[in-house]
């Protein structure tokens, strides 16, 4: 009798909390299943039609989930999880959601065995810490001077995108862009605001290029015969309007004499001429005019005067471009004609309008006193391709940023997950009771990455994962799935590498989200 009393009684949850947990798990898993097919180089793409009727073609996890219409609060947690991974690492947004879905599936089995949710949550958290340590042990330290390693990481990121056939062109652009805006010896982070991706419809992705400094899609105004090429340019960015002043309130001015009308026109003409002369006197020969929603930023008469004074005009500069332009050209924004002075101008050897694949852009070359900025001119035959190329480039830039933050690479192809799963199983054998069962379940959850990679490549997932387990048990720590050849190989020899930070962040964020969902026992509607 006493023997029976010492056996721990299985956790019998109250009916409602159990239902809530299972409902949350089911909702979250449905989100993970929705994007599971888009993982890896052989993953499928999703076509999304937004509420406005726009069409998006992508296989980027964060983009898919951002546009997903999700109602269940637990499912929204997985959408937020993907967004958090995008902010932290910029890549691995699909993997993190798939991992969380797999962890929740294993947690559901443990709940049905009668293990308490808190025990599951805490065991998973410890297992995640053990997995991170295991991955750090197997990571390869790199230096930012090792351009080849940076290229391999950027190429691996691009290989799973729609634009994968252009990875040989886009990977060097991403690497060079990041290295141009940081000091590799001391940098610990990269501000991606210093790298501007300029989209221009036309041409093909092969025409994408890296431009040191500044490139604008807005073209020079030629309607009044203004110049399109200026050497030894003095650049001014103005935030006021070159058009006749208007009263702030709605007023009506009644003119009943043609001489008064003539006087008004003469005053307007003189007002604009004086403004243009002040600009010329300050030495500016290129002016960028910020877009105005109140009235015309520049009128035809002002353009005529500026053309006569041989001043190049580029209008419709967006508000969010101002900071980048100022940093790139060394100029300061000018809010009023009275504060127009030479010390607020930027200087460049050449500002010219060039034509590329039938489209015109303005390039600034030889900029003096410029901050560390670069522009990437992204080209594409249609809007869908162009936007996906921009997203892919952003992911590649984020991968290089990860390597600046944490200078270590890890093998891809499901290799680190299988290695960590094997190590967790060994660790679980040294433990007793429910924690050992939970850690075994966590190791099973990690195997979802190689399983999904194999399934998406059309391989036999059971056969591939069994071979991976066997190879890792025999000490082949870098054995992974070669999706291109459809076999298990030493993945390092195939140059399939990714930043350690991407994997670590994915494991930690997925485990935290699983823990949060496991701890929820009720959903209450607020008034």
Swiss-Prot record:
Domain of life: Eukaryota
Gene Ontology process terms (BP): protein folding
Keyword Chaperone recorded: yes
Pfam families hit by this protein: Cpn60_TCP1
GO molecular function ontology, one term from the record: ATP-dependent protein folding chaperone
Stored PANTHER family: CHAPERONIN (PTHR11353)
Task of the protein: Molecular chaperone; assists the folding of proteins upon ATP hydrolysis. Known to play a role, in vitro, in the folding of actin and tubulin.
Subunit structure: Heterooligomeric complex of about 850 to 900 kDa that forms two stacked rings, 12 to 16 nm in diameter.
Full protein name: T-complex protein 1 subunit delta
